[in-house]
Amino acid sequence: MFNNESRPAQLLGIPQLKQEESTNFSGGFTGRIPSANLSITIDGYIIDIKDRVVLTGQFKGGNDTPQEQEISRLLQAANASRAAFFANAIDSRTSGIDVVVTHKAKLGAGSLSTSLAATFAQTTLEEVNTSSVLEGLEDTYFDRTSQVFLESAVPRTKINLTLNYKLNNLTVFFRNVYFGAVDEATNNVANDQEFAGKTVTDLSLGYQFNERLSFTVGANNLLD
């Protein structure tokens, strides 16, 4: 890792770090149906980040040009084979929508509270900001692995279903959380992997003896 004031950074045209700039747009809706004990909330958003700071790929020297030769000497002097930098390398956009539905109802002698929350979000690469010095090295400056990590290494879908049943002093809590598929990439497409979505189940049983004493037993990730 080299800083942005180093000679390798100057030779590669890696600029000084500057502050990221972001623009946010958001809107929402909330509605209730009292007769059905139902409420709905929907929020949408778009976040544009300009000059986003990321870690570049690994640059190496060479023998083809004086610039490459100097980089090789500098790397050798630093006992390094490659160099990476933090840089304002990309512009990105994150867009998403959050939906929450809640419901309350009598069930037998007790009451059941139900909550369904879903998040659908995606981050996309809008532009790679390179200098003329980096012409031909764009795939190193921000490589394919970094792009996949940005766009699909975290779940783009998350759905959370919660049921909470209360009968006198007894409480039964159940939660299912679904995490959408994710990708793991290398710079070789043939080695890419996609991991399917996964559901995590939590279950607990609680009893309230008095205001100061309660007992709860349960399990997280019950089915794994």
Where are these regions (language model features)?
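Solvent-exposed loop/turn elements at secondary-structure boundaries
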Residues: 1-20, 25, 33-48, 61-62
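Outer-membrane beta-barrel proteins
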Residues: 13-20, 87-92, 192-195
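C-terminal beta-signal and adjacent terminal beta-strands/loops
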Residues: 122, 176-185, 206-224
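Short, contiguous acidic/charged loop-to-helix segments that flank catalytic cores in large enzymes
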Residues: 17, 146-152, 189-196
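Repeated loop/turn-to-beta-strand initiation elements of outer-membrane beta-barrel proteins
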Residues: 35-40, 109-112, 169-173, 211-217
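Residues that define the transmembrane beta-barrel architecture of outer-membrane proteins
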Residues: 11, 21-25, 93-97, 155-159, ...
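Gram-negative outer-membrane beta-barrel transporters
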Residues: 45-50, 56-186
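Outer-membrane beta-barrel architecture
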Residues: 16, 26-30, 41-43, 88, ...
